[in-house]
Swiss-Prot record:
Cystine pairings recorded for this chain: C44-C47
Top-rank taxon, per record: Viruses
InterPro entries listed in its UniProt record: Thioredoxin-like_sf
Role: Participates in various redox reactions through the reversible oxidation of its active center dithiol to a disulfide and catalyzes dithiol-disulfide exchange reactions.
Protein name (record): Putative thioredoxin-like protein 453L
Keyword annotations of the record: Disulfide bond, Electron transport, Redox-active center, Transport
Domain Thioredoxin: 3-138
Length: 138
């Protein structure tokens, strides 16, 4: 888990070593947390359009947590997988993308993990701020 230039905190970039071979999150800091992951690529126009609302949702949830406005206090993490990234550990994620999101069909896509395990659903119903916030708060 690291920080990069495209997204700033509170969105974290995930790497191959953050997952086991079955696609489970294994980062100790993410235990007992709800983690929403945006799977995206820089060349993807839809991803570029979706990044603003994703980042805005991440900041909004963190602000709610800071002010005690959510029962998920300090338990929601926003992360991303940079499928076309050039950092060590990013491209290797493509090898297990089918384990991380078995129903993946294109960029951007979203997947939710709770306590390191993937939740079997289709993700938020849309890419906008309200869809993302309602999804992680639900």
């Amino acid at each position: 888990m690291y920080q990069q230039k495209y997204f700033e905190k509170p969105v974290y970039y995930l790497q191959r070593n953050d997952f086991d071979d079955n696609g489970n999150l294994i980062v100790p800091e993410l235990r007992n947390k709800k983690v929403i992951i945006m799977i995206q690529a820089n060349y993807c126009g839809h991803c570029t359009n979706a990044k603003g609302d994703y980042y805005k949702a991440a900041k909004y949830i963190k602000e709610l947590e800071k002010n005690g406005g959510t029962s998920y206090k300090n338990k929601v993490v926003f992360a991303t997988i940079q499928a076309d990234g050039d950092e060590e550990g990013e491209k290797e994620l493509n090898q297990i993308l089918d384990k991380i999101k078995p129903t993946f069909v294109g960029f951007p896509d979203y997947v939710l993990y709770v306590n390191g395990k993937r939740i079997e659903d289709d993700g938020p119903p849309g890419r906008n701020f309200n869809n993302i916030v309602n999804y992680v708060m639900g």
